[in-house]
Amino acid sequence: MNDHTPDRYVTFLGIDCDAKADRMMEMLSARLASTDSPWVRYFEQKLAEKARMATDNLHFVGSQINSLYSFFEEAEDEEGLDLLWHLEHNCC
């Protein structure tokens, strides 16, 4: 590779996927706390499963990518959608 474009199939070096997944989880928590969307109950259940299975945040984001897109679209959260897109295309 001669360019500086990250190749997710070779390495995650320089992408900082874990920190970005942590940020996504912070954004999710903040959104869940400020809405009465039906998604709240769904994500509460999924987060409880995550805790029981002791999976990391990147695994959770990858497993819930479509639901997260729907939730952040419903919330009209462009920052969340942008971060989610980045995670999906560079980390998952």
From Swiss-Prot:
Entry annotated with the keyword Transferase: no
InterPro entries from the UniProt entry: CowN (IPR024899)
Q: Which UniProt keywords apply?
A: Nitrogen fixation, Plasmid
Taxonomically, the superkingdom here is Bacteria
In Pfam terms, one family for this protein is CowN
The record's Gene Ontology biological-process terms are: nitrogen fixation
State the similarity comment: Belongs to the CowN family.
Its function, per the record, reads: Is required to sustain N(2)-dependent growth in the presence of low levels of carbon monoxide (CO). Probably acts by protecting the N(2) fixation ability of the nitrogenase complex, which is inactivated in the presence of CO.
Under which name does UniProt file this protein?
A: N(2)-fixation sustaining protein CowN
Q: Which organism is it from?
A: Cereibacter sphaeroides (strain ATCC 17025 / ATH 2.4.3)
Gene expressing this chain:
cowN
